[in-house]
Amino acid sequence: MCEKAKKLVIGNWKDNETDAEKVQKKPFLKGTKSSIWGSSASDISGQSRSLKSSSSVLSSKFVTKRLFTIQHGIEGQKPNFKIRSESFSGPHSAGGFSKSTRESRSKSRSMGNGKFRGKSHLRSSSESAHSSGSESSSSDSNSGSSSDSDSTTGSSSHGSDTGERPRMRSAVFRIHETWQSPNSFKAVKTSRENKESRSRSSSLPQKRFCPSKTQNDLTYGSPEPKSPSNRGRNSWRVGMRTPWKKSQSRSMSCSSIQKILVSRSFTRSRSPHRNTLCYQDQSKNPSRPSNYNTWKQPMDEVYNNAANYRKRHNITLTSWNMRNLPEPVLSFERSGFNATILQQLEDQGYDGPTPIQAQTWSIAKEGKNIVMISGKGTGKTLGYLLPGIMKMHNQRGLMQHKKGPIVLILVDCREAAVMVQREVLYYTNPLELRTHCLLGNSQWQGHAECDLLVASAGRLLQMIDNKKHVVELERCTYLVLDNIDRMIDVGLEGNICRLLCRLRPHAQLIVSSTSWSSNLKRMANKFLGQYTAIRVGEINNIGVRLQNIRQRVEVVNGLSKVERLMKELTAIYDTSDIPGKVVIYVKRQKVVEELVDLIRNCVPCEGIHGGRTAQENQGIIHDFGTGAYNIIVATQMTSNCLDVPGIRYVINYDFPDNIDKYVQRMSRTGCLSYNRNCEVISFFTMANYKLVTEVVDFLKICKQEIGPHLLQLAEEKMFGPRQRRRHRPQRYNRMH
């Protein structure tokens, strides 16, 4: 090859151009249409380029390029066009591709500067002999060879193709890389690709063929996300690349719908970079199963038994992950407890777990946080106690260097702590576990190392705040808050929050309550994290046993409540000499003392409240249970301590602040009294006017009789004009 030919391949024009070269170079200027796409084979051969021969004639070198198949020119002949840089020593073979040397490859990499885009010769193999004969003549005329399909000039497009073609970054891509053919999307592997491992080029990596977006994809695109602006459209559906027409919904047959499904383009994702998921016609391949069948939930025997059990006992589960919830324990043998605990359960005469126990035991063994919501007397104590004892028994040998209990149970009052401690001792003594009960007046024994601690919430939280007593909770991994709704009502929410911050980060929390109030929901979302709520009974906190209690709400004047109370007591004692036990609820301790002095003039009576010591209250409750007196006056604080059978009448002298407390008073007296003939009498005044609609709705749900005065107040609140408060003058700080 002559020096001029090598410079043409490299694309670096160092010699001065002659006038003939400038004239022949004009067809390559921007805006011209000198291209092989619009010319015949004879025109291509006539426009062949002739170069001056040099003294040192190089051997013929071919620069391999993609083989184009274009149907035009001589009839019945498919000319194969090749891009080559050749010497003019003689004819060459028309078939196959010749390999380029390492020198030509290294020189061709320097053509990426954009000065000359490598206008190479496209020659037909059928006219190679004619062109080789004219190679000996040293002509300075340059043929108007066609530019590449990837050229940036305006002449890069032929007559039928008017679209712009992408621009190649380097001459390496031009000589050794393949590009997309206008008639095909197949790539031809060149010798460059076959010997890719031998190449040590520092240029950009080879860009293999990747199917780009077609015109259909650009037209329809990926399904747009659903938003208020396109709510009525059908194109937001996931998996549909084209919108579904509403007219096709009913007027199309199954075969036509199947054809449309085959013709449509379904995708795995909205991302355009994901591969398409094609669906084939099932009629052509009947052995292949359908790919778009929906997943069916397994309906095995275990699942059916668990679902029927929950439906039969009205168990409602609420969790962050409903798929991994275990099935309820239907018998003691499947609970996973050791033989000692099973023997103790059999000795007490239990036949099987209660609904709240069956569902709580299976979830508590997995270490999840639980909220237990059920009425009084449903077995919540054993529901959280037995899993805690098993966890304490398994972790007893661990963390010997740390102090504090492994299981901590907090209750709302002293009497409840005594009851829980009695159950704890019955199951822990055979296992030789150390337990301790911290009551109201007892002192903290720092040297007493216990595995399980039962304490009243007020006393323990008071000792934590006191710097004289150091409460160690390093080993505590199981915390129970029994009757947390009562703790929140008393005002211990802030202290409970400080207690939870002192626990280990992975401690398991069990919360039990008789109601599901808004305060409890807020606290559970704040501290329990991904908890599971187990609810047994009606959603509106009304059990079947509460519906059997007769309820009567009387609208009275606040000044005449004492007279109305005496009339009710007189009517009760007139029916029988032994009418049954009566509990009167009030709000303040002062009112307790006043009513006790008034009623004591007629019949024996006593009162309990938080101002008295625990021994005094416990003695009064014991005498009330034995029958020393049948009337007792109590506050809301001590309502949980009245676990006495035989209570028949409950009088709400002061109506509670909300419906939840109203239900608690009934559940802790009427249901625990084991007396179905219990009656609840409530005095409703204008001070409770804001609760009138809730009270009426509650009575309607319980199917109770509603007085006309109460209905009138409810209608006035709902439909009457809104009453404004009287103007109260503001009090300013005056300087005297």
Swiss-Prot record:
It comes from Drosophila melanogaster (Fruit fly). Its EC number is 3.6.4.13. This is Putative ATP-dependent RNA helicase CG14443. ATP binds at residues 374-381. Probable ATP-binding RNA helicase. CDD domains: SF2_C_DEAD. Residues 361-534 form the Helicase ATP-binding domain. It catalyses: ATP + H2O = ADP + phosphate + H(+).
